[in-house]
Structures are given as C-alpha cells and as structure tokens.
Amino acid sequence: VVGGYSFYQSQFNRATQAKRQVGSNIKPFVYSAAINSGYTLASIINDAPINQWNAATGVAWRPQNSPAEYDGPIRMRKALGKSKNVVSVGLLRGGGLRETANYLTRFGFNKEDIPLDETVSLGSSSHTPLEVVRGMSVIANGGYLVNPHFISEVLDENGEQLWQTNPVWACHRCEEEDESATSQP
C-alpha cells in the first residue's frame, strides 16, 4: 500500500508494518477512556507541571507541555484541543493505567503493544499507521470497530467486475441510506 523507493528492492509496507511511536495521536483514545471512567468534556483538570521522583531508579519524570505553558485548571475539552500533555497524564492517572490500557483495545490496539506505564498517555506505544487509522475510525463510526479493506473491486481488461468487497457496515442506518440513494432514478 505504501512503500519506499522500489517494491522490487523492498516489499516493506509502511502502512501495515512500520511501527512508530504515535505521540499525541493517542490522546483522543486516552480522553475517550477518561470519559468511559466518568469524566466529561466539562470536567476540570489541573494543567500544572508534574515532577515525579522514582526512588528505586533515582530518576525524576517530568512530562511537559509543548510549548511548556500551563493553564492551571482547564476543562477537558479545551485541554484536548490544546493537546496538553500533563492533562493527558492526569486523565490516565484518574482513570487508571490498567483500565486505560484495556480500554485502548476497543479501538483495535493490541494489548501487547501498550506499555503499562504513564508514558502511554503521551504516545510512547508503537503502532502502524493502519492501526492508528483503524482506531480513529472507531470514533468516526460511532464506536464500531471495523476492519479496513484496501481493494474495493477488481475489474478485467473490459471493465467487467470480477470481484467486489462486501465490507461490514458500521451502522445499519448508513447501509439503508446507501441502498436508497442507489435505488432512486
């Protein structure tokens, strides 16, 4: 689907095989998990610096916003719009690390790919572009997880259809609208 310089030199498919840290792309899923655990878009979270000392490792963890600006108490909806890192960490803490990791599997992410530490709220997990798109499509599809398809149909040299995909519809109303649109004169 997405390749490099030459398919003959490398059949590596960047859309389906290239796992990369997803960064802030994870935030809609973390926020969704927070809503599932009882937060609302009107919930107020403190956007303030975090300085967490780990005595066992002797290292402090200091996630920061980018830019390093903090708004203090902020509504969840505004924090998402501004992509506030420390709010994402706070929501993960409020909803629970394991609960959030389990919730992310509803979007098609493999549990084995989700680190069980707070950095997951900042996008430290690695996923392929296809996995991220599939996850985002759950939001677009009203909560339905569907498997993406790449080929809609196969035609012969005369334009005759040899094969057509039969995708699962995310909502039955959409399917009915599609059928009524094609049956009208």
Q: What positions do the PLM features span?
A:
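Proteins synthesized as precursors that undergo proteolytic processing into mature forms
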Residues: 3, 7-10, 35, 42, ...
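Active-site SXXK
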Residues: 19-46, 79, 135-139
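Generic, well-ordered alpha-helical scaffold segments in large soluble proteins
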Residues: 33, 37, 82, 90-94, ...
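Secondary-structure capping and boundary motifs in well-ordered enzyme cores
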Residues: 18-23, 68-72, 76, 80, ...
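Conserved catalytic neighborhood of penicillin-recognizing serine enzymes
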Residues: 39-98, 145, 157-185
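Surface-exposed patches in mature extracellular/periplasmic domains of secreted proteins
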Residues: 42, 111-120, 146-152
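Mid-domain, small-residue-enriched loop/turn segments at the edges of structured enzyme/sensor domains
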Residues: 58-65, 96-134
